[in-house]
Amino acid sequence: MENPVIIYVISDAIGETAQHIIRAVTAQFSLNKPADIRRHAFIRDESALLETLEEAKATDGIVVQTLVQAKLAEYATNFCVQNNIPNVDLLHTLTAAVEAKTGLKSKQDPGNMRRLDSNYFDRIAAIEFAVKYDDCKDPRGLLDADIVLVGVSRTSKTPLSSFLANQNWKVANVPLVPEIPIPAELFQIPAERIIGLTTTPEKLAQIRKVRLRSIGLDEASSYSSEKRILEELEYGYDTFKKLGCQVIHVEDKAIEETAALITEIITSYH
């Protein structure tokens, strides 16, 4: 089909749950154009819901709903059935199953998923920690980190730190450069809290050349040369061996996949 698939996310909260699932699903298709995901968040009354549903009808879209309030979910489902609109309710099949199993009734409170509870403030603290101790700005932070990521430049240390911080992990990271001694604090923390990140020389050269182009520098810089990359990777392996830490190859892995491997390793020690 020439036009992109239009998918409406309808939620009485933020709607990010549905959006993540849609992206995971559409990634499995060779679409000519990326799916057009239109998120309609904080839909709390029938008037706003009807307006969105009418738009979905007019554009021949697909509806994906995460409406916690049963009344609104039923309204949306009925409208879609009557108008032949593909509709997926991500919440209520599971809600009904949990109610049947526990004998309890759902609170049907859309805001309950986003309470400013201790978990929320822990996440904010973890994000601030990741920013403060990114790139080993202050080695003292290594002593307080749940996870310490170690690797040469462009092995995804910073994006992984940010991603894991959003899962409430306090993460610090240390760049490995042959000319710069590693901080003594690394040897003062348990090896099971340290994760070494590495990749192949070919992949690292490719990523570094892209980085150099993006900032207007010559691709032929020593930063992306085969000799320099091999030297750094060898230094990295030597460092991992000294630290006694687990090592993950990050080439061809999404941030989410690498993060899952990291948390699996870290939690296996607890």
Swiss-Prot record:
Keywords: Kinase, Nucleotide-binding, Serine/threonine-protein kinase, Transferase. Transmembrane segments: none annotated. GO terms for molecular function: ADP binding; ATP binding; phosphotransferase activity, phosphate group as acceptor; protein serine/threonine kinase activity. The keyword Nucleotide-binding applies. Pfam families: Kinase-PPPase. It catalyses: N(tele)-phospho-L-histidyl/L-threonyl-[pyruvate, phosphate dikinase] + ADP = N(tele)-phospho-L-histidyl/O-phospho-L-threonyl-[pyruvate, phosphate dikinase] + AMP + H(+); N(tele)-phospho-L-histidyl/O-phospho-L-threonyl-[pyruvate, phosphate dikinase] + phosphate + H(+) = N(tele)-phospho-L-histidyl/L-threonyl-[pyruvate, phosphate dikinase] + diphosphate. ADP binds at residues 151-158. It is an enzyme of class 2 (transferase). It comes from the Bacteria. Disulfide bonds: none annotated. Its EC number is 2.7.11.32, 2.7.4.27. Belongs to the pyruvate, phosphate/water dikinase regulatory protein family. PDRP subfamily. Bifunctional serine/threonine kinase and phosphorylase involved in the regulation of the pyruvate, phosphate dikinase (PPDK) by catalyzing its phosphorylation/dephosphorylation. This is Putative pyruvate, phosphate dikinase regulatory protein 2. It comes from Listeria monocytogenes serovar 1/2a (strain ATCC BAA-679 / EGD-e). The lineage of its organism: Bacteria, Bacillati, Bacillota, Bacilli, Bacillales.
